Amino acid sequence: EVMEDAPTVFEIMTAMGMLYFAEKQCDLVMLEVGMGGRLDSTNVIRTPEAAVITSIGLDHTKELGDTLEKIAGEKGGIIKTGGTVIVDGSNTAVMPVFEKICQKTGALLVTSAPEQIRNVVLSPAGEVFDYKDLKELHLSLTGVYQMNNAAVVIETLRVLEQKGYRIGEAALRKGLSEVYWPGRFERLHEQPTFLVDGSHNPDGIRALLKSLRSYFPDKKIRFLLGILSTKDVSTMLQLIEPLAEEIGVIMPPSEKAMDNERMAQQISRECAVRTTAFDSIEEGVRSMIENAEKEDVICATGSLYSIEEIRTCANREFHQNCGGCERL
């Protein structure tokens, strides 16, 4: 029998995941929303132990709405009656949206406090910082925005502890110091520095550029850029231009990818930056590495779709050709 409204691949995967978790009798499961929240297939849980909302930006605007308030309303769909939601405190512009939803549902609203992130030390191995009463937390993820994410994690763990889960400070510190997230301000190499980052919208690019300026002050960056045609390409280019020494253009492996030649032409029209279009990701990675000086910083970004191939090509290129230079 053929269903009139067939489930999507993501819905089938969600159902498979639920079955697997039930069979394994998991004590605690973390479900990540695919897109939005209110209508997402993961949102079948009646009242989770905690709902978590990180920073909100303008992305998937066709599906979720064209303002931060509309997107926040969709994200807020995971807030359930009598539940608890932890929200990144940097979402000040849309916090009233979450407050209104919590008033309506009787949910408890907990916010992180980014302003209480202090005594920050940045290094290639990660970040050290204080948060509220916790001193010298070691975070293995690089990118200054990751400390905001860590603050949300800390508040979430405290909520779970109040619900009876035994976690403890030692486990918290261990988790922060060992967490690994490929493709998020990930350093694949030093001398030259090669970074790969999955930022794919203006807010993501802003966060990436803030981290680049923090880690590499007064330094121009050689970008390897591939973006989907559905994204706000012009705004992303405007943001990147002041920091760019050079832009190499690639096409992400997606039918929605912006054509590399067309994008290179757009960059030439809109930006005063040397630009090269590459026929493949492999060619782009190889060229950027072969033409780099040891002190250069290469940053591959623009799409999550490109990350796996970029990482594979870069690691292979450095392994074959880099001799005595420093690998991570």
Cite the ranges covered by each PLM segment.
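Conserved catalytic-core segment of NTP-binding enzymes
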Residues: 37-39, 44-106, 233-234
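ATP-dependent carboxylate-amine ligase catalytic core
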Residues: 1-46
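Nucleotide phosphate-binding/pyrophosphate-handling subdomain across enzymes
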Residues: 24, 28-31, 39-52, 56-61, ...
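Beta-strand->loop->alpha-helix junctions that form or flank phosphate-binding loops
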Residues: 88-89, 101-123, 140-144, 171-178, ...
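Short, flexible loop segments at boundaries between secondary-structure elements
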Residues: 253-254, 319-328
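Acidic-glycine-rich active-site phosphate/pyrophosphate-binding loop
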Residues: 121-135
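C-terminal helical cap/extension that packs against the catalytic core
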Residues: 91-110, 124-125, 193-194, 202, ...
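Active-site-proximal loop/hinge segments that shape catalytic or ion-binding/gating pockets
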Residues: 303
